[in-house]
């Protein structure tokens, strides 16, 4: 007999393959005994000398910056610098900036040619991996940057920042993001009156193993953008500053202890947007990123700053920080999820994985959370979540599983049908005997204790489950939805096969078919990823 038509099918979804780089926000600085000895011996001599030199440079930079910004509003400027202010800013401050980094031991190698303001009003620097990336700003002639308004109030460096006439961002202003984009566009289209605007389109620091998602703000104006690459080709990496890694003070001290730290700044040809890219900043950002990734010979991923926020949230939930990484840009776009939705799923994931030190869910923990025994049915459900077949579910797989498998199945029709299946005597409530009887059949477990699960659904402790209680529990626990739909499909499959069909083998057929289709969908859509 040919296999029956499957009434329910898993929703087709573009594949969500693992990124080429799992965690671009971690940096493990391992120092050998020789490295420690070298840093100690050089540090005794170099650190005091460099500290004195840097202090002297700052003593010269401070009065120059005061003169440049004298009489200017602290809240930002509305007109570009001209005359002697521009000369002091572009010539003197740039020279002093180079002296400052020279005093820190940096050897700067510049490749390519910086475009003029008319040729490329915006400079995009990547990969952004360190606070030392300010070197790119110095070598670009101190263009304007995007900075928080609070930074202007910082002692000494706040005054230096005012010299570059930054585009200011305010955390307290709800319209700040829109206003920032408008200001960047105004300067970019000024016909060369304003200095170039330098942006770090990744928006956060990575370990330079890939290029993450570029934010669209700097690409909205639709003007030519010059990519600027920054590399640190040193044997000992003392500059990479990531969310998981050494603190800034340690990196600064170790860098000062190095005899020389090499940095390469490369200016690529300006990228002129097509008509389509002018209308779609996302495509323009992706196009520029692709050019930079090709030159750097690095992969690209869809991680973004929101992944860093999820890492912090994972740490607060006692999970390993890397457990929160999901490639937020890809997940949010393909599954139509906002950050708050993913954060909520992280909290649910933490409730299941709290006893697991690795931040991954095993089948035992999955069964314990569902308050069900490990049965073939539950193992099949677990396999649907476990996309890579390694026997565990990480947070990324959990988000995809809940969104693609469970939530679409967790609708009013399914909940009503499932309630009717449990309500054997049709008295509009489910007793523990009815609940236990159906689960024993569905899971293929003769001796099944469902007391704890029944008690959790029975919110008022009345000894029976009403529809409202059942519905509320189902909506808050979408993990059960696939079990419900598989059981409903099982009933229809039995009807097509005939009454003589073995219940357990039919259940296994339905679950296996679902698993095969899910895997097939993932494989067939790899080209779309």
Swiss-Prot record:
SUPFAM superfamilies, per the entry: EF-hand (SSF47473), Glycerol-3-phosphate (1)-acyltransferase (SSF69593)
Residues at which Ca(2+) 3 binds: 458, 460, 462, 464, 469
Residue ranges of domain EF-hand in the record: 373-408, 410-445, 449-480
Residues in compartment: Cytoplasmic: 1-50
SMART domains named in the record: EFh (SM00054), PlsC (SM00563)
Annotated positions binding Ca(2+) 2: 423, 425, 427, 429, 434
UniProt-annotated location(s): Endoplasmic reticulum membrane; Golgi apparatus membrane; Cell membrane; Lipid droplet
InterPro entries: EF-hand-dom_pair (IPR011992), EF_Hand_1_Ca_BS (IPR018247), EF_hand_dom (IPR002048), LPCAT1-like (IPR045252), Plipid/glycerol_acylTrfase (IPR002123)
Glycosylation sites (chain numbering): 207
Pathway the protein takes part in: Lipid metabolism; phospholipid metabolism
GO biological process, alphabetically ordered: phospholipid biosynthetic process
Intervals of motif HXXXXD motif: 128-133
Name listed for the protein in its UniProt record: Lysophosphatidylcholine acyltransferase 2
Gene: lpcat2
